[in-house]
Amino acid sequence: MEPAAGIQRRSSQGPTVPPPPRGHAPPAAAPGPAPLSSPVREPPQLEEERQVRISESGQFSDGLEDRGLLESSTRLKPHEAQNYRKKALWVSWFSIIVTLALAVAAFTVSVMRYSASAFGFAFDAILDVLSSAIVLWRYSNAAAVHSAHREYIACVILGVIFLLSSICIVVKAIHDLSTRLLPEVDDFLFSVSILSGILCSILAVLKFMLGKVLTSRALITDGFNSLVGGVMGFSILLSAEVFKHDSAVWYLDGSIGVLIGLTIFAYGVKLLIDMVPRVRQTRHYEMFE
């Protein structure tokens, strides 16, 4: 009877003492902090991955240029690139037609009204025609839509044209300031200024958008030239209206011409400094031409 009692004592005492630790062991071992620790570890990893991706993307774009390709070759699918190339051609043709008509009108205003800004705008309009023609050459070859070498050659030509046109604009504006030529206002001048300002501004926006998608410095430069044309168109109207109300501010027209000429000159120099070395780097990668 005593062993049985001992067994009963052990059996009665056994369930009371050991099971509680066993029953509480799973909650104690439950991975409560684990889900909290995983989000804490992920942000540093994600941040490191982002930094690595940013550095790799910069190195990758440099590698693309070294191989004669633009960054658009990795962003756009072939049919998308061709679609944007056709849009760039259409915008360039439209720009040539519009700016050529505005150039003729602006030259007429410059001769009839002795306007330095009108002469500067006419020169800039011709520059816009030439730059749009260069963009046409740039995208005339469907296989060269991502060609970095072709892109940089177009930019170098644009830089040279910018320098030559800026010199002509500044010389003409300084001559008008030295001879104290006074601008005149009429309906024809008003119409040319409004049309040139609006149309060139619209063309500039379109070229900037296409240049960003195609990663084309030539298109962006062409857009900058159109933007300058829009500013010059409005400046003709501004200087004429100011002179109409205050004849003492006769120098505003020539001063704007000098400022715009210097701006174009600075942009042309910057373009040549950036693009001439790249033409040399990519001269061996004309695979798409």
UniProtKB/Swiss-Prot annotation:
Transmembrane segments: 89-109, 117-137, 151-171, 188-208, 218-238, 256-276
Catalytic activity entry: Zn(2+)(in) = Zn(2+)(out)
Annotated segments matching region Required for interaction with MCOLN1: 42-72
Topology term for the membrane: Multi-pass membrane protein
InterPro entries: Cation_efflux_TMD_sf, Tmem163
Chief localization: membrane
Effect of residue 124 to A: Severely reduced zinc efflux
Location in or out of the cell: Cytoplasmic vesicle, Secretory vesicle, Synaptic vesicle membrane; Early endosome membrane; Late endosome membrane; Lysosome membrane
Superkingdom of this protein's organism: Eukaryota
Record GO terms (molecular function): zinc ion binding
Protein family according to the UniProt entry: Belongs to the TMEM163 family.
Subunit structure: Homodimer. Interacts with MCOLN1/TRPML1. Interacts with SLC30A1, SLC30A2, SLC30A3 and SLC30A4.
Disorder noted: Leukodystrophy, hypomyelinating, 25: A form of hypomyelinating leukodystrophy, a group of heterogeneous disorders characterized by persistent deficit of myelin observed on brain imaging. HLD25 is an autosomal dominant form with onset in early infancy and characterized by nystagmus, hypotonia, and delayed global development. Most patients show gradual clinical improvement over time with resolution of the nystagmus in early childhood. Many achieve developmental milestones and may have normal cognition, although some affected individuals may have persistent neurologic deficits.
Name of the featured protein: Transmembrane protein 163
Gene field: TMEM163
